Amino acid sequence: MKNLNSNNTPTAEQLNNFFSTIGQSTHDKVQNTKCSPKEFLSKIPIKNSKSLFFRPITVDETRTYIRRMASKATQDIYEISSNLVKLVAEEIICPMTDIVNSILQQGVFPDKLKIAKVCPILKRGNPTDVDNYRPISILPTFSKIVEMAIAEQLISFLNKNNYMTDAQFGFRQNRSTMDAVRSLFNYIAEGFEEYFITSVQYCDLSKAFDCMTHSIFLDKVEHYGVRGVAHSLLSSYLSDRKQCVHHNNKISSTTSIRHGIPQGSILGPLFFIIYMNDLPANLNCHTVLYADDTTLAVRDRSMSPLQDETEIIISEAALWFQTNKLCLNKEKTKTLIFSSSRRDTFSGSATFLGITMDARLTWREQCMTLKHKLHGIVYAIRRIRHIVSPEAALMVYYGLFHSRMIYGLELWGGSCHVTEILISQKVAVRAIAGNDPRCHCRPLFVKYKILTVMAELAIKLATGVYKDKSLFSKRSDRIPYNIRTKEDLTLSRHRLDVTQRSNLALKLYNRLPLEWRNLSETKVRAKLRAHLVDVPIYSLEEFQINPG
């Protein structure tokens, strides 16, 4: 719907109509299949008949849930903010606990807690076009407390019974976007070592969170053991949800939401990863999920069978998406072929969770793309430096430049192209100081206590070993007699440069002082940061000469 209003912006009513029907309209585009979602669920066998029973929560748990809420002054439909709830927490904590326990016991989510206040935010472009607005949904503040109680017990039940797929990295404890990217990278790199060509499908789902079909979701959780009162509560939570739009000091009428998960909710992301949970079990490929971001990878030693396998995987995935009423955008779904052989002429790149991989894993595209973004930030620092202090410019640097610079560094930092990022960082530091472009940078890194990109890389790699140290063997395990390097971890052998980079972390760990190796990861990181702030390094070789 375009240009709904001749005035500057659409009305609250027009925006509400658009937001409330977008999930339905996308859902209706998906044609029915002869399959049932339950057929796909059969690939996840249930080894026991355990059911989820919500236990009553304690006053202390309610207090913890209130403390966990983000401190915000934003008011919900009832003009209640989380700041207000935190202010009066001790006065309401006992009755709130009773209310939550009543909901858990009866299996009914109150209708008053299912009304969302939606505030539209203009994303870009023409302000008269409703497509250019992003809905920001504000749920009743008290509903967050109930949701935390439900989510905690539901997650515990699923994890205890080992129902959640290892392929899902989104909205799960101790898992991150980098873990997801690393899973894909390792699969491709391991294939390189064994002379495999890898085909990766980057699937694009249209409005996935808005399209989740409630009845299909409820069948899925029932399969996992959410039955009886617990099942009724989840059904009650999703049904009869409503929203109204607040825009330009006007409030729209209230409309019903029949599809999708509530934006801004605690339970919504958890519900969605449960919805996607049986996809990997139905595909014979390496699957990496981060919520709705889906990559499917297959590999073979020759191109002809790889193409056949790729077509089969795409077809099977498309059937799963269609049967589960999710809209696969085939125009935006991308295929990229990875190969280490120079005889292959594959090219191109694709971005997954903010990290760009090229067909040979050289990381050139990632570094060049990042360099371009960082140059724009340096320009902004230069402009503001004329009117603010170096301390203020330093805050801008950390907020915009440094955070982008170190994202995914442990993956792409070992490439030769990382020097381009170091050059950009030097330019940024000179801009903070307001110095001449040709001035020496090491004193500036020390003065402002900024870690170089190579220092950040050394810290990430060396401390990263601590998480999986038990997986590596020591040299003393293989050599029976006493040697000086007996406490060093054994390096693995690799055929290619791209896979040999995995040894970088072990090499850096082996250079750490012996007395550090039994310390915690946190303490070692602190020691390295304290050392490398005073001794800026421009290469990993410098770190190996003087690690601490």
Describe these PLM feature segments:
Residues 1-131, 145, 164, 197, ...:
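Surface-exposed loop/turn segments and immediately adjacent short secondary-structure elements
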Residues 19, 48-262, 298, 395:
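Conserved pre-catalytic core of RNA-dependent polymerases
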Residues 52, 249, 312-315, 323-351:
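Short, conserved micro-motifs composed of acidic
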Residues 76, 115-118, 134, 168, ...:
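Catalytic palm active-site di-aspartate
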Residues 339, 445-491:
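A glycine-rich beta-turn/hairpin centered on an aromatic-Pro dipeptide
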